[in-house]
């Protein structure tokens, strides 16, 4: 099936169901096999919502998308992609914007740059650049009129493969692929959607979606009876918040198409998942790996420092950082 054709059809369907803010679906690049993946039940696609303007990082984000800002020497979005690749994903969908062309440039091949690096003897970096998108596909769709996370995920409906897919928020960096792999395994076992969870102090729940467990948690997995977006502290059903990792069955798009504005006047993904849970199982998996929230400059700096010290995705910088700290102690 023509990918562009799929985009046009999806655009029309979403428009008829009230998502008129979707201006276009643009398939920018394709790496690897040119065949659509059909007939597979595996979770193969990652959707990354990346259309936001990154206003907390202005003026830097006026020119450089926040998702491309480096943690060590690796763009934040690449760390999110690497996590998914380690869990078996091979199709990356970026929900971007025409105002952020640098995202498209990052995924575009640069054979001229690779040749220059090899001529200078830097084969390691040339190989690293060549590997971006070499063994996985990249689709880029545009969300020109952002109306919330539910709306952003809906924009990807035209290019999602398979029966279920992953959504990863690029503001949240995880320490490895084990957590996401476990979420995918639970989705495969239950044939239902799965949300990532983390327990927090009850005073923090008002900033997140919060789940109401339907049973006791076993081995980090719990059946979810209900969920609420940004509840008041005294109305929160638990202290288990939803973090930026989801594994969703594709019928979530039916619920997204029916969304009306919720919290903050936006189309909330939480509301779509809640509606889906009325007719299919929903589970949560509590994270067992490090998690960094890079949504603020302070959080971004914390992630860069801690990941360097721990060696999580930031190779070779830990010793340099320790030397800097020691110099300033004296």
Describe the function of each predicted region.
Residues 25-27:
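Aromatic (phenylalanine/tyrosine) cluster motif
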Residues 37-118, 143, 179-180:
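N-terminal glycine-rich phosphate-binding loop and ensuing alpha1 helix
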Residues 45, 90-92, 137, 192-193, ...:
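Residues at the starts of beta-strands that form the adenosine-phosphate
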Residues 103-105, 113-116, 123-214, 257-258:
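Conserved beta-loop-beta/alpha segment of the NTase-like Rossmann-fold superfamily
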Residues 166, 180, 184, 188, ...:
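Catalytic-core segments of class I nucleotidyltransferases/pyrophosphorylases
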